[in-house]
């Protein structure tokens, strides 16, 4: 499975690692993904989902339903 947040679609970012002597090399900045088991109140069931910590913080603030609706994700597929 790819390293993509199933809720927000966040994926890796291409960046540069810069040394002290200013030699630049490419590096991949991965998303901080966590496997979580979340209670979906509206569907009355647990869902297992791989989400980023930023999405988890948003869920704690506004709720799972609102975050899923904002990102156009159908929670019935989980």
Swiss-Prot record:
GO terms for biological process: translation. InterPro entries: Ribosomal_bL28, Ribosomal_bL28/bL31-like_sf, Ribosomal_bL28_bact-type, Ribosomal_bL28_sf. GO terms for cellular component: ribonucleoprotein complex; ribosome. Keywords: Ribonucleoprotein, Ribosomal protein. The keyword Ribosomal protein applies. Pfam families: Ribosomal_L28. It comes from the Bacteria. The keyword Ribonucleoprotein applies. SUPFAM superfamilies: L28p-like. One of its GO terms (molecular function) is structural constituent of ribosome. Belongs to the bacterial ribosomal protein bL28 family. PANTHER family: 39S RIBOSOMAL PROTEIN L28, MITOCHONDRIAL, LARGE RIBOSOMAL SUBUNIT PROTEIN BL28M. This is Large ribosomal subunit protein bL28.
